[in-house]
Amino acid sequence: MSVTLHTDVGDIKIEVFCERTPKTCENFLALCASNYYNGCVFHRNIKGFMVQTGDPTGTGRGGSSIWAKKFEDEYSEYLKHNVRGVVSMANNGPNTNGSQFFITYGKQPHLDMKYTVFGKVIDGLETLDELEKLPVNEKTYRPLNDVHIKDITIHANPFAQ
């Protein structure tokens, strides 16, 4: 199961872990299928750490799940922030997942069991390199020039009916 994020700086193909994180993947794939993420900016970009998106307001404070409420974390001892390109839900504390997600630029073990890992980049690491190089506001970490998710291709959706 995978999706491709088509961004202003290139494509990122992500394998999603539906068996280990079914609720998170159901939410993510449904948001992808409904074009929810189309036009979202990468609103937070910290070199060596991660890049974040998934908020249609572009502020980093918005976004909602398909259930119109926050949903619970799905942690697994097998899913860790142990390499570049791990994809996780962003949150404001335990069980506060919505629509925002981030992609790591490297190992981030301090995030394990705090953020739900639901995927990994399987193609497009060069696009991740381009995102990491973007100049940002030093206080907010927002890229100086907006970079968007243009649209998303779903390669197979086990939740589609």
UniProtKB/Swiss-Prot annotation:
Catalytic activity, reaction form: [protein]-peptidylproline (omega=180) = [protein]-peptidylproline (omega=0)
Enzyme class: isomerase
Cited Pfam families: Pro_isomerase
Key word Isomerase present: yes
Enzyme Commission numbers on file: 5.2.1.8
GO BP terms in the entry: mRNA processing; protein folding; RNA splicing
Known role: PPIases accelerate the folding of proteins. It catalyzes the cis-trans isomerization of proline imidic peptide bonds in oligopeptides. May be involved in pre-mRNA splicing.
The name this protein goes by in its record: Peptidyl-prolyl cis-trans isomerase-like 3
Lineage, top ranks: Eukaryota, Metazoa, Chordata, Craniata, Vertebrata
Gene responsible for this protein: Ppil3
